[in-house]
Amino acid sequence: MRAVVQRVSQASVTVGDEVVGAIGQGLLILLGIGVGDSEAEARLLAEKTANLRIFADEEGRFNRSLLDIGGEALVVSQFTLYADTRRGRRPSFSDAAPPEIAAPLVDVFAGELRRLGVAVSTGRFGAMMRVALVNDGPVTILLDSAIFREPRNQH
């Protein structure tokens, strides 16, 4: 499971002419579900995201989390995070989970954020969406649940 986490002052997602999700200060989370991902990974990634200290404290240091600031989250499914561009010029998405697996896991991720106390808005799974955001920083972090299982580099 992969997430591109962007700190924002506001963000919204529109399908057609309808705004289906909007937030103020918080995180825009583009979430990709991979083949073999599970509910456990969705919960782990949600917990990591909610507690990631990427908001500034009074001294300007990254010491506050989404939970600490009472921020919101906008979760947008994004299968293209699993693009394989090693061959040719057209990306392959064979590592992305099929919709019948991915959609429920996106719901588990969003549900876990809510359980942790985060106000969550979402995009619409499988729809063509327009995402608007105002980056704050900018701060953009890539999270990959596969990396959480590996030991940290000793360099």
From Swiss-Prot:
<dbReference type="GO" id="GO:0005737">
    <property type="term" value="C:cytoplasm"/>
</dbReference>
<dbReference type="Pfam" id="PF02580">
    <property type="entry name" value="Tyr_Deacylase"/>
</dbReference>
<comment type="function">
    <text>An aminoacyl-tRNA editing enzyme that deacylates mischarged D-aminoacyl-tRNAs. Also deacylates mischarged glycyl-tRNA(Ala), protecting cells against glycine mischarging by AlaRS. Acts via tRNA-based rather than protein-based catalysis; rejects L-amino acids rather than detecting D-amino acids in the active site. By recycling D-aminoacyl-tRNA to D-amino acids and free tRNA molecules, this enzyme counteracts the toxicity associated with the formation of D-aminoacyl-tRNA entities in vivo and helps enforce protein L-homochirality.</text>
</comment>
<feature type="short sequence motif" description="Gly-cisPro motif, important for rejection of L-amino acids">
    <location>
        <begin position="137"/>
        <end position="138"/>
    </location>
</feature>
<dbReference type="GO" id="GO:0043908">
    <property type="term" value="F:Ser(Gly)-tRNA(Ala) hydrolase activity"/>
</dbReference>
<comment type="similarity">
    <text>Belongs to the DTD family.</text>
</comment>
<dbReference type="GO" id="GO:0106026">
    <property type="term" value="F:Gly-tRNA(Ala) deacylase activity"/>
</dbReference>
<keyword id="KW-0963">Cytoplasm</keyword>
<keyword id="KW-0820">tRNA-binding</keyword>
<dbReference type="InterPro" id="IPR003732">
    <property type="entry name" value="Daa-tRNA_deacyls_DTD"/>
</dbReference>
<dbReference type="GO" id="GO:0000049">
    <property type="term" value="F:tRNA binding"/>
</dbReference>
<comment type="subunit">
    <text>Homodimer.</text>
</comment>
<dbReference type="InterPro" id="IPR023509">
    <property type="entry name" value="DTD-like_sf"/>
</dbReference>
<dbReference type="GO" id="GO:0019478">
    <property type="term" value="P:D-amino acid catabolic process"/>
</dbReference>
<dbReference type="GO" id="GO:0051500">
    <property type="term" value="F:D-tyrosyl-tRNA(Tyr) deacylase activity"/>
</dbReference>
<keyword id="KW-0378">Hydrolase</keyword>
<keyword id="KW-0694">RNA-binding</keyword>
<protein>
    <recommendedName>
        <fullName>D-aminoacyl-tRNA deacylase</fullName>
        <ecNumber>3.1.1.96</ecNumber>
    </recommendedName>
</protein>
